């Protein structure tokens, strides 16, 4: 799976089923701009093809068990990146203090 949008959709679907329009509104809240249907629906299709989400007859999307595992894995990965960034920031601050 690629792209920030796909992970954000999984994050949005972690608590409840939503249709495409509702997902678009949730994305708008988080990103400040609403992606077009031409952006949202291909991402949803890719997620479904990768067995990360389900879609029912009423066009409501939900996470699969695989989607939940992928989201957990992504969260751990992103947390590690931010942890490493914090450590690098501390290192840079300390090295600046040593120069003075």
Segments and roles (model prediction):
Residues 1-36:
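N-terminal helix-turn-helix DNA-binding core of bacterial DNA-binding proteins
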Residues 13, 39, 53-55:
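Alpha-helix C-terminal capping segments
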Residues 26, 43, 88:
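Short acidic/histidine-centered micro-motifs embedded in hydrophobic/aromatic stretches
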Residues 40-42, 46-47:
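Basic amphipathic alpha-helical segments that dock to polyanions
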Residues 48-58, 62-63:
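Beta-hairpin "wing" of winged helix-turn-helix
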Residues 59-75:
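Basic, amphipathic "hinge/linker" alpha-helix immediately C-terminal to the N-terminal HTH DNA-binding motif
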Residues 72-100:
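Amphipathic alpha-helical dimerization/coiled-coil segments
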């Amino acid at each position: 799976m690629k792209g920030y949008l796909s992970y954000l959709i999984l994050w949005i679907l972690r608590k409840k089923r939503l249709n495409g329009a509702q997902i678009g509104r949730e994305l708008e809240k988080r990103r400040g701009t609403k992606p077009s249907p031409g952006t949202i629906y291909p991402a949803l299709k890719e997620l479904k093809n990768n067995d990360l989400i389900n879609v029912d007859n009423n066009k409501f999307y939900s996470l699969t068990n695989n989607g939940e595992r992928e989201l957990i894995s992504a969260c751990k990965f992103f947390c590690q990146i931010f942890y490493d960034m914090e450590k690098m920031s501390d290192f840079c601050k300390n090295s600046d203090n040593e120069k003075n």
